[in-house]
A protein has these predicted regions:
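C-terminal nucleotide
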Residues: 2-13, 38-72, 168-288
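ATP-binding N-lobe of GHMP and related small-molecule kinases
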Residues: 1-114, 118-134, 139-143, 148, ...
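Hydrophobic side chains within alpha-helical segments
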Residues: 22, 160-161, 198, 263
């Protein structure tokens, strides 16, 4: 009973080009989509947050003074993490009743988790009468996923949700955390995202293993005397010089990062001039 004080809509995102590049300090090209997460919230008189998630028909409740992780409830941990880190950042987060709904397929690769995190952040900030810089909120939501969900994600997903604009892709530099908006809306084309129905969880998809392999490759390249702080700074020449040290698997990982960054640069230029045919070829190359 009763009406919400605030309703927040937080979009999902799709990454056009730039897979496995965000945590390697490279360039990525995501865009926000028209599906997302809706969060209705109102203040309570106590220190509890009571949540209902429509998509999974689950309830969760926690005390703001003792916010911890729970087992076997991913969505609960995303919201718990955001609430805890907002409080740690000095926001006076109030008790709240929260209802979560949306039309993003969970585990479909459209950043349902980042959408939920960012939406929760904005809803709790609104209830607290507080504001936060968009980049800072994106970083806080990323940390919530690291600390409460145990997923070592890069920043791209939260960043794309926070900075996304209709009809624009985001060319994001994951090293400097700056971005440019790239027009990608044209009456002659439509972006179609198909749900394969194959569930995907970052925590169990080999994502963490691949991230460790990239970290290992960077350590080897640095040990060989190359002054780089991320794989995003590695050139093709540097990769060729280190192939023997890296071995086949790590060489493949680094080559993907180097060539993928090139595709983001080229692809954003193609989008800017409306050459969707050439952009499409780069998408095929990216997914090989």
């Amino acid at each position: 009973a009763g009406r919400p004080e605030f309703v927040v809509h937080s979009p999902g995102r799709v990454n056009l080009i730039g897979e496995h590049v965000d945590y390697n300090g490279g360039l990525v090209l995501p865009m926000a989509i028209d599906r997302g997460t809706a969060i209705a919230a109102r203040r309570r008189d106590d220190r509890k947050v009571v949540m209902w998630a429509e998509a999974v028909a689950q309830q969760d409740a926690f005390d703001l003074d003792r916010t911890g992780r729970v087992n076997k409830c991913d969505w609960c941990n995303y919201v718990r993490g955001v609430a805890a880190l907002l409080a740690r950042a000095g926001v006076d987060v109030p008790g709240a009743d929260v209802v979560i709904a949306g039309d993003l397929p969970i585990g479909g690769g459209l950043s349902s988790s980042a959408s939920l995190e960012v939406g929760s952040g904005y809803a709790l900030l609104a209830l607290a009468g507080a504001e936060m810089d968009r980049l800072r909120l994106a970083q806080l939501c990323q940390q919530a996923e690291h600390q409460f969900a145990g997923v070592p994600c890069g920043l791209m997903d939260q960043y794309a949700v926070v900075f996304g604009r209709a009809g624009q892709a985001i060319r994001m530099d994951c090293r400097t955390l700056a971005h440019q908006l790239v027009p990608c809306d044209h009456e002659a084309i439509a972006w179609v995202v198909l749900d394969s129905k194959a569930p995907r969880k970052l925590g169990a998809s080999g994502y963490a293993r691949r991230r460790k392999e990239c970290d290992k490759a960077l350590a080897i390249i640095r040990k060989a005397g190359h002054d780089v702080t991320s794989l995003g700074e590695v050139t093709l020449e540097t990769l060729l010089a280190c192939e023997d040290r890296l071995g086949e698997t790590l060489t493949r990982r680094v080559r993907h990062v180097v060539t993928e960054i090139g595709r983001v640069v080229e692809g954003s230029d193609y989008l800017s001039i409306g050459r969707y045919d050439l952009f499409g070829r780069l998408m095929y190359a990216s997914h090989r």
